[in-house]
Amino acid sequence: MYNVRTDLAVESREIYKHRYNREIDGVVFEEKTVEEDIKVTNVDILNEEGAKAMEKPIGRYVTIDIPEYTHYDGGIMDEVSHVVAASLEELINLPEERTALVVGLGNWNVTPDAIGPKVVGKLMVTRHLKKVMPDIIDDSVRPVCAIAPGVLGITGIETGEIIKSLVEKIKPDLVVCIDALASRKLERVARTIQISNTGISPGAGVGNHRMQINEESLGIPVIALGVPTVVDAATIANDAMDLVLDEMINQADAGKEFYNILNNIDKNEKGMMIKSLLDPYVGDLMVTPKEIDDIIESVSKIIANGINIALQPNMVLEDINKFLN
């Protein structure tokens, strides 16, 4: 069977529904619009049956779809940050004096994969200040620390091992991970933010299966945030072929032999054929938008502000920005 690469729970549900023409038992789906043009979708996987069908762990997956023009409008960026913060706050059940560790996953030398390290560079980190300047830093300010541990190819160390060692040493009460994701739809690239309470498997979307970073491996809650920055080239080619076929079917005379041939094409076999044709020439090619540098800069700011607001509930965004500047 032709498997589409995606890290997004909302897309896994769409693929299942399209393939079997029914909803998934053990999965609850809820969709709402919270701000103008900002849509929030909750996908709750309730049991093992739902987890098996979705190929994802049991838990909540929040998907925030943002307008296309977000990256060029500072006001919309702040609105999205507040929506991200609100979604995070629903998943974070942590007293304000408890410590949070934020981990920016990814390779800072590869732009589509640099979103995690970029977010870390924009965070309000306070753990050291609480120790160095206890008289100046208010008790209502949460101790937050952050790290961008790089990737296995740079450090020679599994990212999960680095984080596990840090957790054992500094003993945070919560880990928040940020990583780049893969999508099956080009229109979702850089326009979707996924938040989950199930942890993360770094690099899974592009076929690199590393040590999982979750509550089971670390012993504390793990919240994962991600933004799709790449799409599998075979998926783009397959979608383009679908558009061509649909248009040819619309133009053909219903009931005629050519119409029946087009209508009976097995889309699963077509997907496998396209992948097998592309593999010798491009391998596992992933595609990203040409404006990815600007996109990563704006999305990292949105996510960083969302995390800052969620982890510092006693501060408003204006005060956080003053602190950072």
From Swiss-Prot:
<comment type="function">
    <text>Initiates the rapid degradation of small, acid-soluble proteins during spore germination.</text>
</comment>
<dbReference type="GO" id="GO:0006508">
    <property type="term" value="P:proteolysis"/>
</dbReference>
<keyword id="KW-0865">Zymogen</keyword>
<keyword id="KW-0378">Hydrolase</keyword>
<dbReference type="InterPro" id="IPR023430">
    <property type="entry name" value="Pept_HybD-like_dom_sf"/>
</dbReference>
<keyword id="KW-0645">Protease</keyword>
<feature type="propeptide">
    <location>
        <begin position="1"/>
        <end position="7"/>
    </location>
</feature>
<dbReference type="Pfam" id="PF03418">
    <property type="entry name" value="Peptidase_A25"/>
</dbReference>
<protein>
    <recommendedName>
        <fullName>Germination protease</fullName>
        <ecNumber>3.4.24.78</ecNumber>
    </recommendedName>
</protein>
<dbReference type="GO" id="GO:0009847">
    <property type="term" value="P:spore germination"/>
</dbReference>
<comment type="similarity">
    <text>Belongs to the peptidase A25 family.</text>
</comment>
<dbReference type="GO" id="GO:0004222">
    <property type="term" value="F:metalloendopeptidase activity"/>
</dbReference>
<comment type="subunit">
    <text>Homotetramer.</text>
</comment>
<dbReference type="InterPro" id="IPR005080">
    <property type="entry name" value="Peptidase_A25"/>
</dbReference>
